[in-house]
Amino acid sequence: MNGTYYESDMSWKLHLKLKSALEARGMEVITTRTTQAGDLGLEARGKKSAGCDLFLSLHSNACNSASVDAPLACCTVTGTMDVLGQQLANVVHQVMGTAQAGTIWKRQGDNGDYYGVLRGATKVGTPAILLEHSYHTNLRATNWLLSDANLQKMAEAEADVIAAFFGLL
């Protein structure tokens, strides 16, 4: 691992770049917060998406093996965003050059989706994806994610996929 990497910093930078890229393609974008400090609870973040066409939560993953280097799109158990989830996982794989291909994954909890942000979005009728940009326990992936230029490439590629999915390209 690279000790200078913080998932929260990467996610914050990437979301700002992705927001700009989506807006440049004609989409309206809202975020769950306006500053990096402070945060809503997990389910409340998802619920903030009421009225939106998509809730997207940006992350990097972690595991106990430094060799795992793959994107993962955690989709809601409803299956409504499986196609877009796979497309986003594929583009993360292509842009980052991860060792393993991207996949989608679902996890059922006691009250619907296991992940609070997905559960919250589903409760207000918003299709949702939690997108893992590989694993920050992998040094190559972490070093890639530390580059602002790489995050810009990722934001542009993800914005193209989302815009195409919604028929805007």
Show the residue positions of the predicted features.
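Active-site-proximal helix/loop segments of hydrolytic enzymes
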Residues: 5-169
